[in-house]
Amino acid sequence: MSIFLCFLLLLPLFLVFYKRLLPSKGKLPPGPISLPIIGNLHQLGKSLHRSFYKLSQEYGPVMFLRFGVVPVVVFSTKEAAEEVLKTHDLETCTRPKLSATGLFTYNFKDIGFAQYGEDWREMRKLAMLELFSSKKLKAFRYIREEESELLVKKVTESAQTQTLVDLRKALFSYTASIVCRLAFGQNFHECDFVDMDKVEELVLESETNLGSFAFIDFFPAGLGWAIDRISGQHSRLHKAFARLSNFFQHVIDDHLKPWQSEDHSDIVGVMLDMINKESKVGSFKVTYDHLKGVMSDVFLAGVNAGAITMIWALTELTRHPRVMKKLQQEIRELLGDNKEKITEQDLEKVHYLKLVIQETFRLHPPAPLLLPRETMSDVKIQGYNIPKNTMIEINTYAIGRDPNCWTNPNEFIPERFVDSPIDYKGQHFELLPFGGGRRICPGMATGMTIVELGLLNVLYFFDWSLPYGMAIADINMEEAGAFVIAKKVPLELVPVLHY
């Protein structure tokens, strides 16, 4: 009797599972054999982009997997990426509904993770016209230049005392200060409810949870729900979200104080004005959840990615003294020896710096997997049938190491971009640090300016050396992170003022 009852209880679970595993019509991409219930999850390590890369060496550039019962197709070449992001952009431009992204974006009320539709189109339009326009980029120039001067001042203090600089902390503080001033109107050098250590803790904790695996997203029926609660995953997600949400509420409350400045030019101020004026675009109305969703996008994507890119660039420059010497010589010859301050006008003069940044993006994309997409209909890509509701993963880490795209792909050679039309703006599919198609990052211009200005300052005013007794071969290149990939071991260098 008990066996019969168990069978009845488990029957719905197996029916759902069996239905999901029924073969699709047409030719699916190749891939490893999946196991019942867990699919191919047992073949994936902590570093998802590296696991995909390794599997693609065996199964090819278009590969079919199952995350539990969810079908996933991984694309690992520029040709495949172009078909997804250009040829079939419309059919693949929505996002999968995952529990972590839904939570941290206030039920997908943001721009990055929202499902494709009218609300997303209106939010995207708002972002391009009001939040990240070229006019806004110019208006906030003074903030970026002030923070870069402060970065130079702090590093100068270390140079004068001949002490190591933890570039993770220095560059995180630089990017976080800029992003929080232009987005939140908060100068954390003067803020009374949070400091920079707290900001860093919030960003890292939130990104870790945002990129974490929730069983409820991939396992059938109530099984995933139960495992998430037993394992503590559900509790961890909600605790991290509560801390982030509390921080956002502090920022909003600060804007709503009656004695607050009349300057509403920051992103929070602009969106609060829209909420208070009850303005509508057609049937679309901006709400507090939309505001917090955008805050989440900007805070989590804008702060860490820029710092990570600068750290990887400085790491590669330290490992390649020839490139470092060539870059610093060009910078100092073009800008002159006695410059007291770097401005954004100087960025157009330093061509080799741009090549170094592009080569850094190729080898160390801040997000080695683009944000996942989902097919909205059956679609044929690279000769394979991809069913509706399939998760799409584009592995930019693999594309950056594809020998069919790049000569000596594992070598750091900025000169490969000399006289090359390839850039980072989403039209060249061998280099996609900001994504491509309809879902390309709206903050791309701001992000690039922050990175270029930060690197130009630390490379113009300072020479850099390894700590005493450390050799280039000792530099640790291990990665860490899930959502964005940072250097695991901090890069600590000795700055020397260049006169």
UniProtKB/Swiss-Prot annotation:
The molecular function terms in GO held by this entry are: heme binding; iron ion binding; monooxygenase activity; oxidoreductase activity, acting on paired donors, with incorporation or reduction of molecular oxygen
Q: Where does heme bind?
A: 441
Record-annotated membrane-spanning stretches: 3-23
Presence of the UniProt keyword Lipid biosynthesis in the record: no
Q: Which domain of life is it from?
A: Eukaryota
Task: Please state which protein family the record places this protein in.
Answer: Belongs to the cytochrome P450 family.
Q: Name one GO cellular component term.
A: membrane
Q: Does the keyword Metal-binding apply?
A: yes
In this record, what's one Pfam family?
p450
Compartments reported by the entry: Membrane
Q: Which residues form a coiled coil?
A: none
Q: EC number(s) for this protein?
A: 1.14.-.-
Supply the enzyme class, top level.
oxidoreductase
Keywords of the record: Heme, Iron, Membrane, Metal-binding, Monooxygenase, Oxidoreductase, Transmembrane, Transmembrane helix
**SUPFAM superfamilies xrefs:** Cytochrome P450
Q: What is this protein called?
A: Cytochrome P450 71B21
The UniProt entry lists membrane topology as:
Single-pass membrane protein
Where is the major localization of this protein?
membrane
